[in-house]
């Protein structure tokens, strides 16, 4: 009988302990050391998702981990994806395709089917590589959930994986969490744990030695590393908790006389694919902040309405907070000054239209039609069919996503040192679509122009003639370095600032993954980890 593929698994004492990032780190380390490696997470609950080349959906974290392995994204890496669309239910996606919306008890009954799919996907993927790196979810010691576990110890047992238990030391109480987790595990589960890794440490690691002795004495498990707090890593956040925490300390406004652009993301209860903002956050002249109320808006240069897993519900939330009224008030120029550019992506794009129709009850209990924000003269009709595809598009000649600012004509760079902010040939953009519904211009409902188009001429984005409002279904539209800088420079000119005129921040995950791997390699005992896996370094590849 063939031996199972060696497997390492990252589990945590809590959510947001850093399992996804550390999984990516070990994927890149193993790749650097000469192994064919692939990531795997049996079940992911997330609103950040990605689309494979063949139009299948999986968690965004596994797409980043695939990049760490320098592999194309494969749906087998995340066979079960849960996308919460209410407080008690989720859309269930199995092997990249939605199988229905389920409440908690419905999904519990469905879990044996989901676990069968997960095991089959794992076995197939593991047969293609030298070593697997698995990620768990939450904590393996949730005693009320263990009977239905398919993502932590049950998956580790199937894979015969060696488990590293990760604790977030920055939150405090990590040693109690490690001991408590081990106490709540069954004996067979404890046997799978190879050791502990502390994550997000700030300070002198030598001061931790007394705690190691106590915890190892109680559990019999060694500490295999202390990973430092990683600043400005340049990789997408795992979930909305970490994303909101990252931006929580931003200043409420950026002084009008400063050189920084103030870009606001409107927070939504069911926000999805907020990774659309990651590339903007890397720009040196941009401050991105999250707002939840009209009082926090200030006077930004741009406002972004992000994706949503429950567009109708989040639109109602905007109204109840007063945000809908505030956004509409900012649509018009006041006092002779240009108002902020307002951008909608996916669900945010749908909200910006005049109407949202849901005749099949995709997002509601019954057929309904709701008024949108009325910022774009378009209407969306929800449908049960889910659009999942990668898309390449190009900006319409001379359009740069911020209107034509005073003193700057498209494609001329007039009066601003010759910097070409809106090129005549247009910018190439690439991304993916994940949505229910079709959006079309209203017949006779006001002027709206195509601003992005695919190679066959199909519209991929719409804008008002003045360029102040535009929307697209394209997740990742700001990942394109040229378009992103052109848009930001147009915002700068709109504010009376000099355009930068060149790409200064390249959105490339590969160097960030190498930096991550270097830090983690230095922080953990790779010799011990290779030993428990029955492997040895083959000699590092050139990166």
From Swiss-Prot:
Protein's UniProt keywords contain Cell cycle: no
CDD domains: CobQ_N, GATase1_CobQ
GO biological process: cobalamin biosynthetic process
Pathway involvement of the protein, from the record: Cofactor biosynthesis; adenosylcobalamin biosynthesis
Pfam families according to UniProt: CbiA, GATase_3
Keyword presence, Glycoprotein: no
Record keywords, A-Z: Cobalamin biosynthesis, Glutamine amidotransferase
Active-site residues, Swiss-Prot/TrEMBL: 346 (nucleophile), 475
Domain GATase cobBQ-type, first and last residues per copy: 260-483
MF (Gene Ontology): ABC-type vitamin B12 transporter activity; catalytic activity
PROSITE patterns: GATASE_COBBQ (PS51274)
Entry similarity comment: Belongs to the CobB/CobQ family. CobQ subfamily.
Biological role stated in the UniProt entry: Catalyzes amidations at positions B, D, E, and G on adenosylcobyrinic A,C-diamide. NH(2) groups are provided by glutamine, and one molecule of ATP is hydrogenolyzed for each amidation.
Family annotation (NCBIfam families): cobQ, PRK00784.1
Protein name: Cobyric acid synthase
Source organism per UniProt: Nitratidesulfovibrio vulgaris (strain ATCC 29579 / DSM 644 / CCUG 34227 / NCIMB 8303 / VKM B-1760 / Hildenborough) (Desulfovibrio vulgaris)
């Amino acid at each position: 009988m063939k031996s199972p593929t060696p497997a390492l698994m990252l589990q945590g004492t809590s959510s947001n302990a850093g399992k996804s990032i550390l999984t990516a780190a070990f994927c890149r380390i193993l790749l650097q050391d000469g192994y064919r490696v692939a990531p795997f997470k049996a079940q992911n609950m997330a609103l950040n998702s990605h689309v494979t080349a063949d139009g299948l959906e999986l968690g965004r974290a596994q797409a980043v981990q695939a990049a760490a392995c320098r592999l194309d994204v494969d749906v087998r890496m995340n066979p079960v994806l849960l996308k919460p669309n209410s407080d008690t239910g989720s859309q269930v996606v199995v092997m990249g395709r939605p199988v229905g919306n389920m409440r908690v008890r419905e999904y519990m009954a469905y879990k044996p089917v989901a676990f069968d799919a997960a095991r089959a996907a794992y076995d197939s993927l593991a047969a293609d590589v030298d070593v697997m790196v698995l990620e768990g979810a939450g904590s393996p010691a949730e005693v009320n959930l263990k009977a239905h576990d398919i993502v932590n110890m049950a998956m580790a047992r199937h894979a015969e994986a060696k488990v590293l238990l990760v604790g977030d030391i920055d939150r405090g109480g990590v040693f109690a969490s490690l001991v408590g987790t081990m106490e709540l595990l069954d004996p067979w589960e404890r046997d799978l744990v190879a050791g502990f890794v502390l994550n997000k440490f700030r300070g002198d690691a030598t001061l931790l030695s007394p705690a190691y002795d106590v915890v190892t004495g109680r559990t019999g498990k060694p500490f295999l590393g202390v990973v430092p707090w990683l600043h400005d890593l340049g990789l997408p956040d795992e979930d909305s908790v970490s994303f909101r925490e990252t931006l929580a300390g931003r200043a409420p406004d950026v002084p009008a006389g400063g050189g920084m652009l103030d870009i606001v993301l409107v927070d939504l209860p069911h926000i999805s694919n907020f990774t659309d903002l990651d590339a903007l956050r890397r720009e040196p002249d941009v401050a991105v902040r999250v707002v939840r109320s009209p009082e926090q808006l200030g006077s930004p240069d741009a406002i972004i309405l992000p994706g949503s897993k429950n567009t109708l519900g989040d639109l109602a939330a905007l109204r109840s907070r007063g945000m809908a009224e505030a956004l509409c008030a900012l649509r018009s120029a006041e006092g002779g000054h240009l108002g902020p550019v307002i951008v909608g992506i996916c669900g945010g794009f749908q909200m910006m239209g005049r109407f949202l129709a849901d005749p099949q009850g995709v997002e509601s209990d019954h057929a309904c039609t709701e008024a949108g924000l009325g910022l774009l003269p378009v209407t969306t009709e929800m449908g049960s069919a889910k659009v999942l595809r990668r898309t390449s598009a190009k900006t319409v000649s001379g359009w740069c996503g911020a209107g034509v600012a005073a003193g700057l004509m498209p494609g001329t760079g007039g009066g601003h040192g010759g910097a070409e902010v809106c090129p005549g040939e247009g910018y190439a953009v690439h991304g993916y679509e994940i949505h229910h519904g079709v959006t079309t211009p209203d017949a006779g409902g006001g002027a709206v122009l195509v601003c992005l188009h695919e190679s066959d001429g199909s519209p991929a984005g719409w804008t008002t003639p003045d360029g102040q409002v535009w929307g697209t279904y394209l997740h990742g539209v700001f990942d394109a370095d040229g378009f992103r800088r052109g848009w930001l420079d147009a915002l700068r000119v709109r504010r009376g600032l000099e355009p930068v005129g060149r790409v200064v921040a390249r959105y490339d995950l590969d160097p960030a993954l190498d930096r991550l791997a270097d830090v983690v390699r230095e922080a953990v005992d790779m010799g011990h980890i290779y030993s428990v896996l029955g492997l040895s370094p083959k000699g590092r590849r050139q990166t």
